[in-house]
Amino acid sequence: MNNKNLTPTVWPSGIGIGWRPDIAGVVAALPGLGFCEVIAESVPAVETAESWLPDLLAVDVPIIPHGVGLSLGGAEPVSAERISVLTRCAQILDAPLVSEHIAFVRAGGVEVGHLLPVPRSHEALAVLSDNIRRTQDFLPVPLAVENIASLFEWPDDEYSDGEF
């Protein structure tokens, strides 16, 4: 599905927060909250959000599925199955967009269990761009990408963090 002509009815703006059920009361009382993120991989396979997010829906802010497992920066193409998780979440939550990290989380079929920084090279940038484009082509809403805190630098980086 290509969504380049879609115009969301509500763009999230302002300050957002990552949703956790144990902070539902705090979130509900936050003044001026612009949006909430929900970890996409934790969204159950249900048809509506009412059955599992009633407290968040009561806050009445846009809910953004936030992925942590696409591995956009990985050398392997992004899995269609993982993209379908984001698609399903966007549909269930009536989300104006979805987001994911600029990171890699697997290589050679091995999940590392952590968001790892992408080497800042020409080659890695080309792979990242292809993976973002491929992912966006199958999503029903725009994809926002978020950088991660790099805890280390790759020895052969060709760009600074800001340039990349």
What spans do the regions from the language model cover?
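Structural preference for beta-strand elements that scaffold enzyme active sites
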Residues: 12-16, 34-37, 60-67, 95-99, ...
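Acidic (Asp/Glu)-rich catalytic clusters
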Residues: 26-31, 47-65, 81-96, 133-138
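Short, basic, glycine/proline-bearing loop/turn elements
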Residues: 9-11, 34-40, 67-73, 117, ...
